[in-house]
Amino acid sequence: MNERKYAILGTGALGGYYGAKLQKAGSDVHFLLKSDYEKVNQDGLLVESKDGDFTLPQVNAYNDVAKMPKCDVVVVALKTTQNHLLPKLLPPIVKNDGIVLVLQNGLGVEEEIAEILPQVHIIGGLCFLCSNKVGAGYIHHLDYGQITLGEYAHGYSNMGITDRMQQISHDFQTAGISIELLEDLLLGRWKKLVWNIPYNGLSVVLNARTDELMADTYTRTLVEQLMYEVKAGAKSMGRNIPDSFIQTMLDYTVKMKPYRTSMKIDYDECRPLEVEAIVGNPLHKAQEVGVNLPQINCLYHQLKFLDGRNRTGQLTVDS
């Protein structure tokens, strides 16, 4: 058992899977839950995985951060639509000189946390994971699982490979989770957006799985156009994404099992969509420096309309 104590904020498809793997490998893990608390506190966690199913009959489950111990590493695995809760959730459980590991999609999340806790170390994690929460405490891991880690510094300046990244990498790799270490977190975030913007966005707008988007000539072309706009957005912030990476993402998705994206699942279940973190923030960062991304701009406005109507039955009206 390693000496680092982990807290998992958001025990869903992502946090539940990685937290369960860490505990199974001997880490001291503490899970914050909301609606699933009673079930998980009583019965633990079940992970059904392509790599082998397993059950954790007992876990450290909490429904209140005030009851949780101070932890060395706090894993933020909430949807970004819940980030307004972080000023209340994070300060009670992060040790002085502790680490906040942000396993969230999109751009700008590390900056938000640095404003809340300027004294802690922040590491961004980019997860390449196909996983769904089937029920309370029941996670179905379909494919992949790799995490790419990069440490945050003010303005997303390049931090290189730090000792803190190496320590977390060791714990996760001991748990059977593949880790890649990044010298440049901002480049990594933009690379992740190459996949996230087209597939998450179009899956909602067009009511389609990833395999359907890739099987049709017209939608595949649209996916590729959106990817090249993400490349242009990255360039506007001084980061270069090679064309070969875009081709790799297209090939990777063709080989993937048919997948309903996380944004599509949220839409189908009438939950708030991560439109701002995944689409809005990158779009606005590019616009701030005079770079227009017309396809992404169109996608953003479509998603804002669908998200508002889906959850409230009302249209978004300027105040």
Curated annotation (Swiss-Prot):
Catalytic residues (UniProt): K192 (proton donor)
GO MF annotation: an example: 2-dehydropantoate 2-reductase activity
Enzyme Commission identifier(s): 1.1.1.169
Binding locations of substrate: N105, N196, N200, S262
Uppermost EC category: oxidoreductase
Pfam families reported for this sequence: ApbA (PF02558), ApbA_C (PF08546)
Primary location: cytoplasm
Keywords on record: Cytoplasm, NADP, Oxidoreductase, Pantothenate biosynthesis
Pathway(s) the chain acts in: Cofactor biosynthesis; (R)-pantothenate biosynthesis; (R)-pantoate from 3-methyl-2-oxobutanoate: step 2/2
Assigned GO CC terms: cytoplasm
Superkingdom of origin organism: Bacteria
Record GO biological process: pantothenate biosynthetic process
Residues that hold NADP(+) according to the record: G10, T11, G12, A13, L14, G15, N105, E274
Catalytic activity from the UniProt record: (R)-pantoate + NADP(+) = 2-dehydropantoate + NADPH + H(+)
Compartments (UniProt record): Cytoplasm
Task performed by this protein: Catalyzes the NADPH-dependent reduction of ketopantoate into pantoic acid.
Family affiliation: Belongs to the ketopantoate reductase family.
Entry protein name: 2-dehydropantoate 2-reductase
Organism: Nostoc sp. (strain PCC 7120 / SAG 25.82 / UTEX 2576)
Top-level taxonomy: Bacteria, Bacillati, Cyanobacteriota, Cyanophyceae, Nostocales
